[in-house]
Amino acid sequence: MTKYIFVTGGVVSSLGKGITAASLGRLLKNRGLNVTIQKFDPYINVDPGTMSPYQHGEVFVTDDGAETDLDLGHYERFIDINLNKYSNVTTGKIYSSVLQKERRGEYLGGTVQVIPHITNEIKERVFRAGRETNADVVITEIGGTVGDIESLPFLEAIRQIKSDIGRDNVMYIHCTLIPYLKAAGEMKTKPTQHSVKELRSLGIQPNIIVVRTEMPVSQDMKDKLALFCDIDPKAVIEAADADTLYAVPLSLQEQNMDQIVCDHLKLDNAPADMTEWKALVDKVRNLSKKTRIALVGKYVELQDAYISVVEALRHAGYTFDTDVEVKWVNAEHVTAENVKELVGDTDGILVPGGFGDRGVEGKIVAIQYARENKVPFLGICLGMQLASIEFARNVLGLEGANSSEINPDTPYAIIDLLPEQKDVEDLGGTLRLGLYPCKLTPETNAYRAYNEPVVYERHRHRYEFNNQFRQEMENAGFIFSGTSPDGRLVEIVELQDHPWFVAAQFHPELVSRPNRPQPLFRDFVQASITNKESK
């Protein structure tokens, strides 16, 4: 029988529910259990694909092309599994599905209501996640905060699941906050007590409470919370601020959280062997070298917009005993006059993905600087497109070269719409999304990175390199080192006369793992370290 664990949050958002869920998933996986994990987001958007990164942070793309919440990135990195479209569910998706069924007449003329129709649809998404992956344990994180109007149908659905399949098969974990008041010099449990009271009023009694805190939680305080919240004192788990996210699973294990879960769910698996994970955390805490990478983007004020990129850089650094420091450079501020001042003190330059024209010219200036000064460069998605445009402008002399996305009237559309995108009107869910093959050219940096003739990477784009300019650019030293298997679509480009200048149309950051860095990121960071040492 599949077991179900539900993770809710209270008091404030951004408490780290996702990290808690991912860490528990890692512990259960290391006990030999097949774990899958999903995130329920209460917003009415069908997915975050058209949402601003300022609103939502990064959009994480799965193998099967779902545009999802950034928490799925944490899940994949911690548990080391590839998730699918069933791993992220929104209110918009639920209502869309129910309304389509109503139009097809599947409700036999009945009145369609939140209970049972919406809640049944939510429950079906929970159970489907288990069925599709043949999971022993399904962990479901409920986005938002208990008390939000938007979350109510989800909370009612997960309440019903305990009645449907029995208490031994369901567990509720509530993440909350114990604030520290500096003026009073005290930590306060009252917000947590009220949050649990709110949750219990909805019919859900948490089995474990995970408390986020800046300061250590005393045993007296745990006993007090246990008394008022009606749980075992051992089930009050402290989630103190950690020096690295990857230390969280070890902290939870030290407090026997995974054993409490297994005892409740009647799982008799052996304790998790976290030897390799401990070695990883020790390595992360004792890196002996440093390198500095300039990340030139337009959402740099909100670092969550590039969270997978930053994690992929860190993972690559771990391989070389190196702490990768990211210098955040706002692309809108970069000019030919100040580019050296802004990126000259870094060892490598990275231009990540994005949409729209804001900050584009600054990114192109940064790319030109990397090309002319032999600085290691990695371009991702839009970064690859702009690297192509920069080369066309400044090496081929094609003045005004651009992308038709940025300037529809450009005389040289180096980047243009994919043919199948010409007549697409809807923005949501219509990009080239998900896993596609890429054929690599031998004796290139890309091939050396992967050491494979064909690789599969995740994509999220609408525009593509225009093959009309391919031969001319190739003749000038622009290498097309990765293409679709039929050779039609350009996937990776690099420079002939440069130590390491590689740009990819796909998003390599999405598949990086802390113990298995993505090959392009690994070689980019290695080239940056070499560049630093040669100065």
Swiss-Prot record:
Domain Glutamine amidotransferase type-1, first and last residues per copy: 292-534
Binding site for L-glutamine: 54, 354, 382-385, 405, 462
Pathway(s) where this gene product acts: Pyrimidine metabolism; CTP biosynthesis via de novo pathway; CTP from UDP: step 2/2
Domain of life: Bacteria
Stored CDD domains: CTPS_N (cd03113), GATase1_CTP_Synthase (cd01746)
Activity control, per UniProt: Allosterically activated by GTP, when glutamine is the substrate; GTP has no effect on the reaction when ammonia is the substrate. The allosteric effector GTP functions by stabilizing the protein conformation that binds the tetrahedral intermediate(s) formed during glutamine hydrolysis. Inhibited by the product CTP, via allosteric rather than competitive inhibition.
EC number: 6.3.4.2
GO function term, MF aspect, one: ATP binding
Annotated catalytic residues: 381 (nucleophile), 507, 509
Enzyme class: ligase
An annotated GO cellular component: cytosol
Binding site for UTP: 13, 188-193, 224
Reactions catalysed according to its record: UTP + L-glutamine + ATP + H2O = CTP + L-glutamate + ADP + phosphate + 2 H(+); L-glutamine + H2O = L-glutamate + NH4(+); UTP + NH4(+) + ATP = CTP + ADP + phosphate + 2 H(+)
Single Gene Ontology BP annotation: pyrimidine nucleobase biosynthetic process
UniProt keywords, alphabetically: ATP-binding, Glutamine amidotransferase, Ligase, Magnesium, Metal-binding, Nucleotide-binding, Pyrimidine biosynthesis
Keyword Magnesium in annotation: yes
Presence of the UniProt keyword Metal-binding in the record: yes
Region (Amidoligase domain): 1-267
Other facts: CTPSs have evolved a hybrid strategy for distinguishing between UTP and CTP. The overlapping regions of the product feedback inhibitory and substrate sites recognize a common feature in both compounds, the triphosphate moiety. To differentiate isosteric substrate and product pyrimidine rings, an additional pocket far from the expected kinase/ligase catalytic site, specifically recognizes the cytosine and ribose portions of the product inhibitor.
Subunit structure: Homotetramer.
The family this protein is said to belong to: Belongs to the CTP synthase family.
Entries under NCBIfam families matching the protein: PRK05380.1 (NF003792), PyrG (TIGR00337)
Role this protein plays: Catalyzes the ATP-dependent amination of UTP to CTP with either L-glutamine or ammonia as the source of nitrogen. Regulates intracellular CTP levels through interactions with the four ribonucleotide triphosphates.
Xref: HAMAP family: PyrG
Protein known as: CTP synthase
Organism whose genome encodes this protein: Bacillus cytotoxicus (strain DSM 22905 / CIP 110041 / 391-98 / NVH 391-98)
Protein encoded by which gene: pyrG
